[in-house]
Amino acid sequence: MGRILDISGQPFDFDDEMQSRSDELAMVMKRTQEHPSSGVTPNRAAQMLRDAERGDLTAQADLAFDMEEKDTHLFSELSKRRLAIQALEWRIAPARDASAQEKKDADMLNEYLHDAAWFEDALFDAGDAILKGYSMQEIEWGWLGKMRVPVALHHRDPALFCANPDNLNELRLRDASYHGLELQPFGWFMHRAKSRTGYVGTNGLVRTLIWPFIFKNYSVRDFAEFLEIYGLPMRVGKYPTGSTNREKATLMQAVMDIGRRAGGIIPMGMTLDFQSAADGQSDPFMAMIGWAEKAISKAILGGTLTTEAGDKGARSLGEVHDEVRREIRNADVGQLARSINRDLIYPLLALNSDSTIDINRLPGIVFDTSEAGDITALSDAIPKLAAGMRIPVSWIQEKLHIPQPVGDEAVFTIQPVVPDNGSQKEAALSAEDIPQEDDIDRMGVSPEDWQRSVDPLLKPVIFSVLKDGPEAAMNKAASLYPQMDDAELIDMLTRAIFVADIWGRLDAAADH
């Protein structure tokens, strides 16, 4: 394929061979994890973070891998953020006021990505950037009919990459060179999740979470040692003056063995005493572990009450924290959408579109982050609101996440209740018996009469509500009463009573 333009407008020669399969990277791609978290100290952690600031991302990436693997609480909280993205519906939308060709391109991309088996896994793997700051997936290109498309995305170890020393925001593959190997255009799906402002090596949550991770592990280790001796009697061996080192070692072995096997032997002349059982409290250890886990939850999800039970008011505070978590999720999908548009949508369009591509009018992925409305509350409010305003049905369906029926699709309906007329008495009067029926009906109350009568009555109240608000209108209710015009209402009620009386008399006469 000839030269094409990347998303920044620079021409390049497209190569569909995977960059990681080149001979110069063969040894680099075979690396294994170093597991720097084993025995990590605050000083060692600080050194790894400083290395990442200078562009060496290897140790920090390996450290993040270990943290997620070893800490179940950290893993659980990260999983909530990653899986929240996968739970969202999405679509490829064209630019605003799209032309026919732009709509065609968007439909083509939407259909392909929804059918792509690798896309959901790619979304999940992109979530790895939340902790590590970046996620790198190599694109394997192939053919689908006449379309040049990705057939697979391969997640690559973040430790394989470094930052360009001359531009710490540019990721490159690590090789034997000082600057690293530049990434192949259209060859990588790179997602950067910025949890903080800074260079690529400082974006990840790992830099914040490493400290509660270390302090929690210290407390867990100390707590385990406390449990080993808690409740056990103190064992003291006594040896006579002049005992040899061998005799002392024999006594020490007996002291240690008797704690595990409840038996042992010692030389004559030596004694073994049992003191009071070791006591103490586990509260300090558990308090430290609890603090560390809450700090981890705050850093990842913005709060703690979406994770565990709280004290009084936990329900309302939990709802607030859940709203914060939704805001974090929306920010995550906003960053992810930009990465997808840059590294997947644009290359697909550049390689397969029949028209000239305008960088400013590209289709893009749109995640549906809207929440379904409370159907009970809306069902009660909509009829009342509809009395004073025009409400589009499409808006109600969007709020409730109820789709519009397509074609002759079956729809749910309420079956009308058929009254049982068997036990009802047949009407005693007929049109022939009462030729004046139409005249009596005209004397009754029509909907229009009711509206004309009520409008003057309520006009002062409505005006006060619109001008000052409902609360002010309630306070002024007593003063508004004299302004209400009830003349029409009195006349309407008089007519209604008269008609009801006439119908009652005629019905009674017919029964006789």
Swiss-Prot record:
<dbReference type="GO" id="GO:0030430">
    <property type="term" value="C:host cell cytoplasm"/>
</dbReference>
<keyword id="KW-0167">Capsid protein</keyword>
<keyword id="KW-1188">Viral release from host cell</keyword>
<keyword id="KW-1242">Viral contractile tail ejection system</keyword>
<comment type="subunit">
    <text>Homododecamer. Part of the immature prohead complex. Might interact with viral I protease; this interaction gives rise to an early 25S initiator complex. The scaffolding protein Z and the capsid protein T should then be added to this initiator complex to yield the immature prohead. Host GroEL and GroES are also essential for the correct assembly of viral head and tail.</text>
</comment>
<keyword id="KW-1171">Viral genome ejection through host cell envelope</keyword>
<comment type="function">
    <text>Forms the portal vertex of the capsid. This portal plays critical roles in head assembly, genome packaging, neck/tail attachment, and genome ejection. The portal protein multimerizes as a single ring-shaped homododecamer arranged around a central channel. Binds to the terminase subunits to form the packaging machine. Acts as a linker between the capsid and tail. Required for attachment of the neck proteins to the capsid.</text>
</comment>
<keyword id="KW-1035">Host cytoplasm</keyword>
<keyword id="KW-0118">Viral capsid assembly</keyword>
<dbReference type="GO" id="GO:0099000">
    <property type="term" value="P:symbiont genome ejection through host cell envelope, contractile tail mechanism"/>
</dbReference>
<keyword id="KW-1162">Viral penetration into host cytoplasm</keyword>
<dbReference type="InterPro" id="IPR009279">
    <property type="entry name" value="Portal_Mu"/>
</dbReference>
<keyword id="KW-0426">Late protein</keyword>
<dbReference type="Pfam" id="PF06074">
    <property type="entry name" value="Portal_Mu"/>
</dbReference>
<keyword id="KW-0946">Virion</keyword>
<keyword id="KW-1160">Virus entry into host cell</keyword>
<keyword id="KW-0231">Viral genome packaging</keyword>
<dbReference type="GO" id="GO:0019028">
    <property type="term" value="C:viral capsid"/>
</dbReference>
<protein>
    <recommendedName>
        <fullName>Portal protein</fullName>
    </recommendedName>
</protein>
